[in-house]
Amino acid sequence: MADVDDGSELLFFDTFSHEEVTDINLDLVQFPKPVFITQVRIIPLGARVQADFPGGVRLGATNPSKFDLEFFVNDLGMPAASAFENLGLLRYNQNDCIHLDCSQEKIVTDGLVLRGWYSTITLAIYGIFTNSVTEPIASPTLPCEPVGPEIANLSGEVLLQEDVLKDEWQEPMQAELLTAHKGNVSDYDPEDMEYGMSRDHYHQHAEEQEQREMRRLRRSTHSTDHSPPPPRRSHTHSESNDREYIRCSRDKGSRDWSRSPEYSSHRSRRKRSERSRSVVDEHKWPRTPPASIDSPTRPRSPDTMDYEDEDSRSHYKMQSSHYRHSSESLHRGERDRDDEDRSCTPQEQFEPILSDDEIIGDDEEDDAVDAAAIAEYERELEAAAAAAPPAIDAFEPWQKPLLVFEGDMAAHFCKELETLKLLFKKLVLQTRCENVNAFSEEHGASVDEREQFVYLGEQLNNQLGYLAQHYKRRNFVLQQFFGNDELHLRQAANVLQIALSFQAACMQPQPAFKIRHIKLGARMAELLGSSEELFQHLLKEHKFDIFEAVFRLYHEPYMALSIKLQLLKAVYALLDTRMGIEHFMGAKNNGYQMIVEAIKTAKLTRTKYALQAIIKKLHLWEGLESVQIWCRRLFVDRIIIPGNRDQMEDTVITCQQIEFAFEMLMDALFSSQLSYLQPRRFLPVSKKFEVVTDPTAQRSFGNALQSYLGQNSLAESLLVMLANCKELPATTYLSMLDLMHTLLRSHVGIDYFVDDAFPVTQTIVAILLGLDEVPRNPEEKEEKAEKSDAEDKAMEVENEAVEAGGEKPTPPTADEEGKPVAAPISVPAPAAAPQVRPRPILRPVLPRLARLGIEMSYKVQTRYHLDAIAYAAAAPEYDAVKLATHMHAIYSQTCDPAGRQHTVEVLGLNNNLKIFMDLIKKEQRLQTQRQLSSPGTKYKSPVLSYAVDMVDACVRYCEQLDYLIEHGGVILELAKNHETFEPSVSAVLQEMYVYMKPLEAINVFVYDDIMPLVEVIGRSLDYLTTFPGDLIMAMRILRYLSISKPLAGQKAPPVTEELKHRFVALQLYAADGVQLCIQIMERLCAYFEQPGAHAPALMTIQGVHCCQIMLPTLQILRELLSYAILCRDGTYKDLTAIDHLVKVYYLLYYFPTRCQAGPEVEQCKMEVVQTLLAYTQPNEQDEESLHKSLWTLMIREVLKNVDGPAHFIPGLKLLAELLPLPLPMPQPLCDQLQQQHKQRLITERKLWSAHLHPQSGQIAKLVEALAPSSFPQLSELLQRVCMQLSDLAPNMTLLIAKTITELLCNEYQTSNCIPTTNLERLLRFSTRLCAFAPLKSSMLSILSGKFWELFQSLLALNEFNDVVSNCQEAVHRILDSFLDSGISLISHKSTASPALNLAAALPPKELIPRIIDAVFSNLTSVEVTHGISILAVRNLVILTEHDFTFYHLAQLLKQKITEFQAWMERVILHNETVEYNANIESLILLLRSLTQIEPPPAMSAMPHRTLKLGATELAQLVEFQDIELAKPPVLSRILTVMEKHKAVANEAALSDLKQLILLQASKQEILAGTSTETPPEAEGEANPSASSCSASLTVEPYLPQAEGIVTQYEARPIFTRFCATAENAQLTARYWLDPLPIELIEDMNEPIYERIACDLTDLANVCLNPDLNVAGDSKRVMNLSGSPQSNREMTPTAPCFRTRRVEVEPATGRPEKKMFVSSVRGRGFARPPPSRGDLFRSRPPNTSRPPSLHVDDFLALETCGAQPTGPTGYNKIPSMLRGSRVGRNRGSRISAAAAFRQKKMMRIGSPSSWAESPGSYRSASDSHFSSSDSHYSSPHYSGRPRGRGLRSRPSYLR
């Protein structure tokens, strides 16, 4: 160690550490008493230091190896000790310069501030203790100078106005001291004008910068008295702070504008969101506070509390204090100044550093003088704060109206219009183009003029081609050029006629000019074909048929192929307008026929391809036109006749045609777009390595398609269909939603919705979101309130447009009110219709509609802001305020996860990102201009910051990489040159650079070599759990190269298959790509071990980053495995990936439902399922190979992983996703599709059953293990899986049935025939399974034997505790299903014998009498008020539905009439003497069912009932034989009870009872007369012949033996009619695939005794190993321990420039490389409550002891999991508690907006079914044995709603 000055001693030795090196860091050393600092020495990394204090050798830990370090001290020798003194600058270099000598300064100080770009620093400070301190000197008051009015705007241009821009818009001033300002504006320095202050002001207050620096430092480490120290960069401001700031801000006096120019704020991303609105609302703020507020007794330097947080301004803080904002870092600046350069004149005042309370206290001394001014100023501040909007301009689709930008297009496109006019003028002046004849030599046209025509015509074509690049621009310019201007029309017509004239072309002297002339004409016709004005002018005025002229050229002999193709392009473009198509199709020679003939005669493939593109374009027009006609016919012109079969059939046919048109449009948008284009140099082949796209052809087709959509009013058709969706078939309704989603994925659809159909779009969004009216602007609401009778200028135009589109609007009807979407929104009603108050619907019923509405609203709003930004950027006057306002709004949209996704999708479309790239270039040029006057200064610009933020958002979150191909190189260079920008922008660019690293490889998007990408991924694996951006981007690029674009709903293969993707997949597979993907999945699953415990982290941005890695990994793995299995077929046996795929699914299951990555999680789940289904591709031929097939092995691995409590529910859900959904499924409209699907569905289920059969034992074990579960959610999901398994084939349903039966019997026998809780659970589990038709059939086939004996034994039990009662209730419910003939595999259209169908639906006929006896015996033995009694009566009622069961029931009642009458007496007595009970209504229903026959259902395959009891039998049944005659009849007693309790009795039961009394009375009348007389007519109507009925009851009806279960399976229905709006849960895929939410499970399914008390401590002692370290393992699982991996993994995102340090593994002692994670900012400084003393001097000592812990001791403590505290303690906060954030990334921004996100979640996520999956993954037609339908129905097993087959039952027995 080098010698130091004599007398110097070591004052301080310690290490400071920080998380990141990306920020300038500050640290403070405080000494216990004043000292002279003589030397500061930095200890390099690894350097050994021998110290005199205890502890021996220490090691340096300074990192990085080079940086600049500035030192500041509190100079106690200066007057009032108020100035920070610059002690010096050390340019640290570990090999050269490590110490700073300060012996010359001799400054007395008690604190040292360090500022530098370091992450860790070890330093030693030497000095001399002293006691000399200069006393403070009082100072006179300084007069307040007014602020100059000259202020510059954001672009640097001078604005001579009084409104002062807010501080956050201003840019930092250079720290130099210059001369006083002049009075002339031109003499101002630009940076002076930026701040509105002169250099005089700055010169006068030069020393006050140090005061502001110290106050800034002090504020950065102190908080309010009642709040704990918040985490670094996450200061939360309370309301008390807001009020305190308002009070303090009045002390600023006339220097309120002042702020530290050099230490300007290092804004976070959240800060930028607030900058945007400051200028907009600047008029609401007072420019300066009253001058009299300054204290007259003592001058005060300007308070700089606004030094850092823009949100600390009161108007932000009052409304947005709930946002978290990052604290800010200090900027680097020039700080070396000599004492001579400072003014030390008496006029320069100094003051001691005071606390905030002291400042406020000083104000109290002047209250008598300043009270009025203070109150007025505070009122101004509070009013401005109340009027200020929130920091984040949240877009709320349910509340905020959609907007469309209506800029001044004439001014915007004036240059293009003038250029076009100039070119035509030159053509007219320099050539003879009056007509074709004038172009010839005979009329004086020279050779030069003819050649000039070609030159100028090509220039004109170039300009027209430029116009055609933008649909809106082309239409506007041509409409302005030709609209009502005969001169221009005449000029263009003449030029076009000459250009298309073969004669004129032949007049060209040179052959080259002849060809150029013809090409010129073809191109001009193509470019001018979209103008209807010109087309009409040519036809009417010139009698010129442009189609005829083009075809004449086409058929000229020896015409070259290239020219023919160009002429066909002209024909193609001329068909963009309705007038062009009508003329083309209606000509003398039909144009369509001409094209067909040309195809027949064409010999070249390229010619045929171009001709068929014209045909397809005409078909597309016809389809869109027919949709408009059919929608008008269906919903506007038609009068609905209920029950009209012809009308229903016509509707089905029409809807089928609409579906075909929609499929054609979706096909044209994506999958087969190439077949609609006219690409250059394209040879159509079936397979090609790469199809080179032609942007011009794509743009031409896009323009044509948008024109077609507008001319055929597609949006109006969609609106009408959406409003009348109840009348649509399911497939049509879903096809319409698919089309809307497809349109929103393309820029053509978004442009159409915004530019051509905006009023209708607003109404569509309102319907999708379930709103009762379109949201309006507040201004519009006020206008409407003031002028209720006036037409609203904004919204009523929309309604008129909708009415014009519909012409004959339909009024809202009752039907529409029952729709699943918003009932009040429909086609607007006529004015004459009565005013019906709409019922407000705040939420949609269907989640898919809401998601579609949110997507549409965000994308339309994004287009509005993009248009506004583009117009403002191109305006002659660069208005940065307007730009920043719109950019802030679009930035705010990205604060919501859904809005962020939809916003970046729009940015990635149609080269929209170019808008922001151009803005960045423009801002860079402006900064270069500013730097001419102030070299080296980095200016701030909100426009630049927002533009960089939006590019960053696109880079981070946009999955489509078209933007990267276009702008990737520019973005990469921008990120590399981040140091040229101010720090806040530089930090964003540095983080963006990590994402852009893969683009450093040469030609990364070339398909020849993907090894650079594989290397990037391999390198990133070590840092996988930090979610590095380079890995995310590399995986996205690899996915782009290896997988063709996903085409939703693609049914036909593309025209030309590209082989490049398969080539990349082969390269990746050869480079161990499968293992690479498995490693990524394995590490993520290991990091989130026990994922249920990580749910809070998965809810945050950490979950988003996890999915950003997981999704492309799964997609690539699926592509590789699918291709490998397809190629190798049955020889592929690698099952390595299955375990990892299942674990990934478990991890995805535990993502919270409404997490930020919700859509990505669902997509990842689908990818896992589809990847597993790839193992079902091989076709096995024999039974032996079937047992070892890849399909069977995959199922075995999946079942094997359902191995623990945390895996039961997600494992069953995965199994449910893999298995086919139960039949029947919705019936397609097309009969041909129905036949195709039928065979495929049956074959698919047979194959699944065959491959599951070898795993029968494993399936049985799974059911046995989970069936007794008391957890309702698990039991519910297992029931669904069992139903899916049993639906496959007879062998699987028998497996499930036998497993359940064995479980029940074994449980009963094991418990010595005593019912147990476990048996009750199993019976309750079986109840629902027996109501499922396939399982009922198999259960009935094995019912005879011990299964029935179990039921009989349970029903015979007479001890009635809760367990027995519940068991008996379950048995009754099972018998209910067994006896219900409506639950059957037999279709209602079955042609078999009805008796045979009945035999299949009932238990074996020999068991039926025993079942009836057991039910009746149980009924008579239980209490009449018990629920079992009602269930037993219900089963007896079901027995009356068919003759066979009715016969045996009647025989039993005759045999046991005494018991029946005794039971009746008990029921009647209870109701007479105790209380009214519903069992008396059950008795009435039973008697009614015995005596009356219900009318048969319309469609039934079961035999009709013919038997019933007559009046005599009824009398025998209800009349007692041995009772007193004084007692009234039974029915009369029942009537008395019903009349007595009429208020609660059921009216239907009372009506039935009166009919029974009448029937009994008819029997008494017969007895009073002759016994041989016939019954009265009334009885004859009810019973045709009593005697015949009685006779029939003596003969048992015939019931044949039931068919086998295999035969029943073959006869079951495959399809059923399905209504998309029907409220039947079983008809949707969600019912089968989603676990039942716990909150929806009824209490009756979870009895109280099932909630078993449990002592977790005892359970842990029993189940866990005594040697297990629970605390340590818990920390390890939660990544809270100090293991070598954990600290690296705690950082949620990768830092830009990774730094590493050596850690020691506690177990092994070996060093381990790990990511460096530092302590929170502030070094654990205490935060005492404010006091009147000096905060700097009153802070308790924390780093002042020289013998303190060294960095190595810190690392040892940290590694062992300890929490070091004390003077150098880290006081680390785990990342889980601190929140998921790093630096300034977008994640911290979103995490910070907690209140905003919570509001959005409440708004978007309130319905419980909001996050339900949109449907089955099986909608993709290319999956193996997949189904294109996502909804399934099953009327055969859905159970009877009232328990009596297909006939309705009285409501009182529900």
From Swiss-Prot:
The modification Phosphoserine is found at residues 186, 258, 260, 276, 295, 301, 312. Its main location: nucleus. Residues 202-361, 777-821, 1570-1589, 1720-1788, 1804-1854 are annotated as: Disordered. Changing residue 1283 to K: In vir2f; XX-specific lethal, interferes with sex determination and dosage compensation. The modification Phosphothreonine is found at residues 288, 297. InterPro entries: VIR_N, Virilizer. It holds the Pfam family VIR_N. One of its GO terms (cellular component) is nucleus. It is found in: Nucleus. Changing residue 1423 to K: In vir1ts; transforms XX animals into intersexes at 29 degrees Celsius. Residues 1738-1748, 1816-1838 have a biased composition (Low complexity). Residues 202-214, 236-259, 275-285, 325-343, 777-796 have a biased composition (Basic and acidic residues). Keywords: Coiled coil, Developmental protein, Differentiation, mRNA processing, mRNA splicing, Nucleus, Phosphoprotein, Sexual differentiation. Residues 779-808 form a coiled coil. Associated component of the WMM complex, a complex that mediates N6-methyladenosine (m6A) methylation of mRNAs, a modification that plays a role in the efficiency of mRNA splicing and is required for sex determination. Required for sex determination and dosage compensation via Sxl alternative splicing: m6A methylation acts as a key regulator of Sxl pre-mRNA and promotes female-specific alternative splicing of Sxl, which determines female physiognomy. M6A methylation is also required for neuronal functions. Component of the WMM complex, a N6-methyltransferase complex composed of a catalytic subcomplex, named MAC, and of an associated subcomplex, named MACOM. The MAC subcomplex is composed of Ime4/Mettl3 and Mettl14. The MACOM subcomplex is composed of fl(2)d, Flacc/Xio, Hakai, vir, and, in some cases of nito. Part of a complex containing fl(2)d, Sxl and vir. Belongs to the vir family. This is Protein virilizer. It comes from Drosophila melanogaster (Fruit fly). The gene is vir.
